[in-house]
């Protein structure tokens, strides 16, 4: 199995989701099938949901959310893609970290694409319990040669 921190710099299609809260709709699994990687940003809640996601095929990286009881899942995962330092965590930090170019998080159930200082904050929204009028959503992150492309996908 390849070390996720040392994958080639070719374009990678990463399927990003968060806050599934014990539910993984079939549509989400269908969308995820074409991914090179899957990143779940926490609040999976049930191991069976992670098992379903892993059965889709691509490598799955997960971080623990505030509703997750599995202490084997890390709170933070730092990765490098396309020459950029990416931090995956569930709850967004209060301040922009100095050691990351991009922070991907869940928790708020609201999509986010915001630059704070030199750090880009991205949130795919929530699969099952959308907030503040946002529709349920997931996202695609394409990474290559120091560039990112973020595309939100509504599940409505």
Give names to the regions the model predicted.
Residues 19, 43, 65, 106-107, ...:
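Active-site glycine-centered loops adjacent to acidic/histidine catalytic or metal-binding residues
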Residues 152-156:
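Well-ordered alpha/beta subsegment
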Residues 54, 72-90:
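Metallo-beta-lactamase
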